[in-house]
Amino acid sequence: MSLISTVDDHTQDTASVASGSSATKKKYNPKVYHDDNQPLSKEAMYRAKLKYGVYNSPISGGVGVGVTDYKAATNKAANVANDNQTTVEAYRRLYVDQGAASAALKVGTEPVREKPDVHAEKFKQNRALNLNYTSAAAKALSVGTEKLFTASEEARHAGQKTYSIVSQVSAASTSRAMDMSKVLKGAERKAESRLKERSEPERKEYVKSYSMTAGAAADYGAAGGAAGAAGAAGAASRSIDLNSDVMARVAKRSELPPKQEGPTEKERNAAKFALGAATAVKDLDPKSMLPEDFAAREQQRQEFVRHMTSQKVLSMAREKVDREMASIDKQQAERRLYDNDSYNRAAVAIAQQNYQNKLNAQSEKAGKINIGGGLFLTPQEVDNIAHGLISPVLGEVSERAEAQRAADTEIATRIATYEKDLSNWKNLQRTKQTNDKNVLEVNSKRIALEKQEAKDAAQKKYDEMIKKMDETVAEKKKQLEAAKQRLEDLQEEMNMKLGMQDQKVEEELQKWDENREKDIEAARLEQEELVKPFQDELDEAEKQHEEFLKERDGIDTEITGLQEAIEGHKKKIEIYEGDIRAHDNMHVEEGGKLENLGQNKETLANTLNNDIIILANKTKEQAELSTKQARLKQLEVDAMVNERKSELNQTEIQLKKEKLQLLESMRNKAQARGDEKIDEEKVKGLFGMTSEEYLAKHAPKKEEPAEEKLETVAEEASAMKKEKPTAAAATTAAAAAATTPKKPASAPRAAPAAASPKSEKKRKGSVFDKFFLGPRKAHMIEETRTNQKVAEEKAKMDSVSKPHLVSTTNEHAKPHAAATEEAPKKVDAPKPATEVKSSEAAEDEENKLEHTFSGFSQGSVADDKGTTSGAHSETKKDGYFKEVF
């Protein structure tokens, strides 16, 4: 067993030389294993570290030596050594064939039977015997020195060999006679030196801390005992690795040039490199690699630990732990190693079984020769190894001689054949040159004749083509003249037709333009009639909205003034309360004086009267404060009502605009379809009745003149003034009149339509602008180009009767105009609170709008049933939702 690894399986190379150059190889991959599953000895591990330059620096404190589990250390080392081919190759034990075993047997050495005796003297005898046996094996291995390359080497270099006749002849002529005596002496000398180096390696102290002193050796011997000595002896005796590759490299080294570096030199350089690395580690100062403040921090830590610990506390803790451990041991006595009798019996039985197995394994090796490295062979196997090494050498000599004779015969045969083929080739070349000369003359004459014939044929063909093309050109010219004449006639005819067509088109276009102008003017007048009621309602609603905004601003101003007055009254009340407290104190003092003196009765009565006056003033201020707070609440309610009315007006304005757009879209749709009437189903879905029913229900009424309206409003105002308002109403009216601002304090949420100085005609025109987009003339010209029958379709559209649409829209807009006329009533002097509520309900009832459908949302349509009460109640109005697309 070597210091690093053992190899169970071997690589066996079986070479058989056939026809002088062929070789076969049978190779087994080695497997690393550990025989007895025991760790290496300390000495073996120390020698391995010295050999490979392993040094465990004290700087790396946390890094241990080897692996954590000592049982797996040997297998780990063997696997690492087997994977690292550059370092293991020189020490690996390979297969020793039968020739080596046979040669070792013929030397005359006696086999040594190893016994389980581990005494020191026995160890020396076994080592000497092992050296003799391995020397004999080395002699047997070196017999065939001329055949240095084994079957595996020949297979590797097979691609580099050439087997030409010249190389075989030169190899045969330059080969020297083999001197077996020199080969055997050199092999024996090398083998002995190598065995000595492996069995007794030189100890060099690369690192003093890792060298084994005499005391350490004594400790090791005392601790290890006989078993340790036997293990060391076995490791030293089994550390011999001889193989064919190593022996081949040893013999080849003698034939290399002096300056050429072989595999052994490379291994020596690796050893030097390891030595240099170990020396560098030795010279390394561990303190230089530590941080600068390492010593200071360590001293600080020790000082901290010294202050934090106490010998008394440690002793008490130690005693407590000992007591607890003792109690635990007493409780678990069955688990202790020496107290468990069954465990001890099983351990003794297993130890006896292991010892018996070891004796059986040693008895199997009895009568065998220890070749080294843990290999034991019988004498017959050694004889077979020697025979296998010598026989191939003699067979190779005879095979080379026979191959040389066959090569000489083949050379003579090939030379004769070559000379005969050369003479035939020369005759063939002379005949070829003569034939080439004759062929060139014949070909030149033939090419000249063919060239002249081709030239004559081409000239004749060219003349015929010229004549034919002249005739074609003359005919084409005649056709061109005729085509030009036809083109002129066609142009004159087309110009005449185009002129007539242009004149006709201009006349039709002029007529169509006149008709379109008339139609557009009629449509504009009709649209103005439709939009007029809605425009009037919109103007009235905007005016009413502005009045509501002004009224709201006035209320806001009055609220601000009242709040300031309330703050002033609160301050006065606080002053009066302070005076009351002062008078109370004075009253107490005066009472004491009255009891003591009894003379200032009149002065005391005056003081009491002053207290009563102050209480009266306080009560008065509180009454004024309550009045103004009530007024403030009333104004806030009025402001909220006005704001809601303003929002209602905005909604009504938007509703009217959407109603206008809906009516216009329905009218345009009916005109586009060419219908005589509007779709009655959609009208019914919108108004809840057909157009005829709607006209019958809403008969046209005459509008009152503006002067009559003004008179009616003045009469109502005078009647309201004659009525006796209540005190609250009078106060509200006075406050409203006093706080009416000249300008609005805040802008409305939605800005109303600004009053513009434009004329009524321009304003109506702006309303119609959204129905006519783009220049009218361009639009009419585009329609003329795209459709030739516009005039006929327009005539059909003009024939459609539309009075029902006009009357419907006018009658529908009438109630809204009447409602907006009553709007000025809300800016008169306010009535009492109860009357204000009833008037507001009446105004809501009068100003309510007919629910209609916006073009893109749902709206409720009022039922035919009317409400009997004047107050506005949403619960009494039944409606349904319709959606028209």
Curated annotation (Swiss-Prot):
<dbReference type="InterPro" id="IPR024527">
    <property type="entry name" value="Eisosome1"/>
</dbReference>
<dbReference type="GO" id="GO:0032126">
    <property type="term" value="C:eisosome"/>
</dbReference>
<dbReference type="GO" id="GO:0005886">
    <property type="term" value="C:plasma membrane"/>
</dbReference>
<feature type="region of interest" description="Disordered">
    <location>
        <begin position="695"/>
        <end position="885"/>
    </location>
</feature>
<feature type="compositionally biased region" description="Basic and acidic residues">
    <location>
        <begin position="701"/>
        <end position="725"/>
    </location>
</feature>
<feature type="compositionally biased region" description="Polar residues">
    <location>
        <begin position="13"/>
        <end position="23"/>
    </location>
</feature>
<feature type="compositionally biased region" description="Basic and acidic residues">
    <location>
        <begin position="873"/>
        <end position="885"/>
    </location>
</feature>
<comment type="similarity">
    <text>Belongs to the EIS1 family.</text>
</comment>
<feature type="region of interest" description="Disordered">
    <location>
        <begin position="1"/>
        <end position="39"/>
    </location>
</feature>
<dbReference type="Pfam" id="PF12757">
    <property type="entry name" value="Eisosome1"/>
</dbReference>
<keyword id="KW-0472">Membrane</keyword>
<feature type="compositionally biased region" description="Low complexity">
    <location>
        <begin position="726"/>
        <end position="757"/>
    </location>
</feature>
<feature type="compositionally biased region" description="Basic and acidic residues">
    <location>
        <begin position="779"/>
        <end position="801"/>
    </location>
</feature>
<comment type="function">
    <text>Required for normal formation of eisosomes, large cytoplasmic protein assemblies that localize to specialized domains on plasma membrane and mark the site of endocytosis.</text>
</comment>
<keyword id="KW-1003">Cell membrane</keyword>
<protein>
    <recommendedName>
        <fullName>Eisosome protein 1</fullName>
    </recommendedName>
</protein>
<dbReference type="GO" id="GO:0070941">
    <property type="term" value="P:eisosome assembly"/>
</dbReference>
